[in-house]
Design a protein with these regions (language model features):
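Rossmann-like S-adenosyl-L-methionine
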Residues: 2-23, 31, 237-517
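Short, conserved phosphate/pyrophosphate- and ester-handling motifs at nucleotide-, phospho-/glycolipid
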Residues: 52, 181, 332
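Short, acidic/hydrophobic/Gly-rich beta-strand patch recurrent on exposed beta strands
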Residues: 35-40, 163-166, 230-232, 389
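Extended interfacial segments that mediate partner engagement and assembly in macromolecular machines
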Residues: 72-83, 90-205, 223
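Structural signature of eukaryotic scaffold interfaces centered on beta-propeller domains
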Residues: 219-221
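Terminal RNA-binding accessory module
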Residues: 2-88, 410
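Residue-level signal for inorganic ion chemistry
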Residues: 37, 52, 95, 216, ...
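Internal alpha/beta scaffold segment
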Residues: 172-214, 235-274
Length: 517
């Protein structure tokens, strides 16, 4: 009897049956955007729900310690529930919390960062209440994305469609009117789809690997107004056409290419039209070979410094960036200005400091820092991004930023490990050597997995006065902050930034001060 009771407690799913109807209240949101509700202590994950909803669900999957439910109906809506602006929000799944008021979205994201710092980082609630600042939100939390990638397919009637993949599937939800993208996206897509229909241009079919048009990439410079369109194509479908894979071939890459170009050029702001060659059976969108069909190879955009103490008003200081179809560039330029201006403010630069910028991408933060630092060293693993960073520095007349290609966890320890040899090398000044091996500030902006352990260890050995951590994942942020604090640093300021309204994602900027071991 006792063993039966123990087994039953261990397997709480035994209290439920698949397809059983249950009621619950949503008490939290998961990292994937699913609502979390408990029934007799057993948690269910339920899509399309928000905190505060009283819902009826159907149990669709039962695991040992948690299950998944499908929303059947909202019994009592949350006071934070609003009518979503997009009619595709449930099918698409890209905007997991669009049914939540924007004010509550910001509160949710603040709590998400705080809870991870509490639970994973082990920081005290009183400390966090003292150092955490309000989430930086958007005045207009729609139409903020400067980049969109639309898969192209065929509907049941054989007509070309563009849209987005339904959650966790490869089924395209036809939608040319995503409310996160710019207004021009719809006009561009409709022109391409009409061209495909009129000239019987095939869409790529993943199962067979046949078909020509795979994706459409659209980028827009918010300050310049310049628009780039890149069609990702599968030219193996056009076997027999000589020269189809010749670099810079003057042959047409698309049937009736001239007609498509004429339609796209008529759209205001059109600056660049190109194709990306991707013949692989892969879910990677872009190919590595780009051919410009019309206009420039790149578009430009300018990121301005903002005054964080004056409601984030623009200061007039800006950095211009050159953007190719393959460039990494933050997709929300309005919030990017606020995010990087916070990082610049937290760095506390006076013009005399040396700074390392780790995971620097195309140099966005590095070039922001260069205007107020003596020297900036940027590190990025993607060689093309480093080439872009160097070119962006040259385009802006910046001479005090130096960039290195490689993994931060290899480049930084490599430099530090060779400090004695470099210190005695000809041509290196004492001030330059000191700044490189003992910087005043280190800025890190790692991917979701956070900083590598070797990188963190070297940062602690370098012992900069300040570390500014820009994070896109508050769980790995909390883990890394604990390591740095155990190594002699103290949290000074934490501020979340809403880079992706209508989604569960949140970025953060953190200032740490060295206080000794």
């Amino acid at each position: 009897m006792g063993q039966d009771r123990i087994n039953r407690e261990e397997r709480r799913d035994m209290d439920f049956q698949k397809n059983q109807l249950l009621t619950t209240e949503i008490i939290d949101i998961s990292t994937e955007g699913e609502g979390i509700g408990k029934v007799n202590g057993y948690p269910f994950f339920i899509k399309d729900t928000i905190i505060g909803d009283q819902v009826e669900i159907r149990a669709i999957k039962l695991k040992k310690n948690y299950g998944y439910g499908r929303l059947e109906k909202v019994i009592t809506p949350s006071p934070f529930r609003v009518t979503p602006s997009c009619c595709f929000h449930r099918q698409c799944g890209g905007c997991q919390i669009q049914a939540m008021s924007y004010e509550q979205q910001l509160a949710f994201k603040h709590n998400k960062v705080r809870n991870n710092l509490l639970r994973i980082g082990g920081f005290g609630p009183e400390e966090l209440d003292r150092i955490m600042e309000p989430v930086v939100g958007m005045e207009e939390p729609f139409r903020y994305r400067n980049k969109a990638q639309y898969p192209i397919g065929m509907d049941k009637e054989g007509n070309p469609v563009a849209g987005f993949y339904a959650g966790r599937t490869h089924s395209i939800i036809a939608n040319t009117e995503c409310l996160l993208g710019v207004d021009e996206n719809r006009t561009i897509l409709e022109a391409i789809l009409q061209y495909m229909k009129e000239y019987s241009i095939s869409a790529y079919e993943e199962a067979s690997g046949k078909g020509l048009v795979r994706h459409v990439l659209i980028r827009k410079g918010f300050t310049s107004g310049e628009i780039m369109v890149c069609l990702v194509i599968n030219p193996e479908h056009m076997k027999g056409r000589t020269g189809i894979r010749e670099k810079n071939s003057k042959r047409e890459w698309l049937p009736h290419q001239k007609e498509l170009i004429e339609r796209l050029v008529a759209i205001r702001g059109m600056t660049s039209i190109s194709v990306s060659i991707n013949c692989e059976k892969t879910n990677v969108i872009m190919g590595t070979e780009i051919h410009t069909l019309w206009g420039k190879e790149r578009i430009t955009d300018t990121i301005f410094v903002r005054d964080v103490d004056n409601c984030f008003a623009r200061t007039g200081d800006g950095i211009a960036f050159s953007i190719s179809p393959l460039s990494f560039y933050q997709v929300n330029p309005v919030q990017t200005e606020k995010l990087y201006s916070l990082a610049l403010s937290y760095a506390g630069l006076s013009g005399k400091e040396s700074v390392w910028d780790l995971y620097c991408g195309i140099g966005t933060i590095s070039l922001f820092l260069s205007g107020r630092a003596s020297k900036v060293y940027g590190v990025e693993v993607v060689p093309q991004a480093i080439e872009d960073a160097k070119q962006n520095a040259a385009n802006n007349g910046i001479t005090n930023a130096e960039f290195f290609a490689g993994k931060a966890e290899e480049v930084l320890p490599g430099f530090y490990g060779r400090k004695d040899a470099v210190s005695h090398s000809a041509g290196s000044t004492e001030q330059g050597r000191e700044g490189m091996f003992h910087p005043d500030v280190i800025v890190v902006d790692p991917p979701r997995k956070g900083c590598d352990e070797m990188c963190l260890d070297t940062m602690l050995k370098m012992a900069p006065d300040r570390i500014v951590y820009v994070s896109c994942d508050s769980a790995t942020l909390a883990r890394d902050l604990r390591i740095l604090c155990d190594g002699g640093y103290e949290l000074k300021r934490v501020r979340p930034v809403d880079m992706f309204p209508q989604t569960v994602h949140v970025e953060s900027v953190v200032l740490m001060q060295y206080c000794g071991k």
